[in-house]
Amino acid sequence: MLRWIDQGTARGPTRPAGRAGDRSVQFNTAQRELTLKIVYYGPGLSGKTTNLRALYQRILPQLRGHLMTLDTADDRTLFFDTLPLVFTAGTLKVKLKLYTVPGQVMHNATRRIVLQGADAIAFIADSQPSKRQENYKYWLNMVENLKANGLDVDSMPNVVQWNKKDLGDASTQEAIEKMRKENRQPVYEAVAVRGEGVVETFLGLVDLTFTQIDKTYLLSQKIGLDRRAFVEEVRRCLVDPPVPGPDGKAA
């Protein structure tokens, strides 16, 4: 269980690990197809959609589907965003379906629905000191909604990304370092609007996710696809970011 650092002291709730519910991971042995659902969760305006947009820019055009978004006038996600990625790893056809959830309090029912069948979660926290309590609140909300879907945060791959790192302060860095020492979840720092830390967060979660499903489907034994090879295939789906010109814009 993640020991969430709320203003440097508070921790996440302690509760017995629940059963893992039905996830959406689909492995078609006959056609050798694997489908995974990854959800980006977190407070409103923490950078969930920004992460997906940054990934969209990095994925090879021939491998990515359409990035579907439905935003309100103030650039908040109204329902959810989805970004499909389809590629081949060894002899396996892989479909990664990336989702975000709306952050506004009023859309909790939608967040619960989007979490149905999730295989992995990236929790996007806001590094601004004023958002510390809100981060904690939404972590608890995520745990509750997972439980409502028969899922348990302790038994599924998940990472934490502290986004807007450029807007944090010394207390934020202290909280991040403390979280890294006390929790099993990998913790990443990012400035998603500049694309920094986005790919690292994504690949880190992909790594954890494959490790989890390999225990169930024994992919490394059955088709000779191990964790390193899988992550490397995902990495090959990405292109390098454009190099900034003298004016700071992409050349």
What do the predicted segments below correspond to?
Residues 166-218:
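Canonical P-loop GTPase G-domain recognition
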Residues 45, 104-105, 128-130, 164-168, ...:
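Conserved nucleotide-binding/hydrolysis micro-motifs of P-loop NTPases
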Residues 22-70:
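Conserved G1/Walker A P-loop phosphate-binding module
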Residues 97-100, 122-126, 160-163, 189:
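Conserved beta-strand segments of the P-loop GTPase G domain that flank and frequently precede/overlap
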Residues 68-106:
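Switch I (G2) and immediately adjacent beta-strands of P-loop GTPase domains
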Residues 108-129:
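Inter-motif core of Ras-like GTPase G domains
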Residues 196, 207-251:
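C-terminal-of-GTPase-core extension/linker across diverse P-loop GTPases
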Residues 127-183:
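Conserved C-terminal guanine-recognition region of P-loop GTPase G domains, centered on the G4
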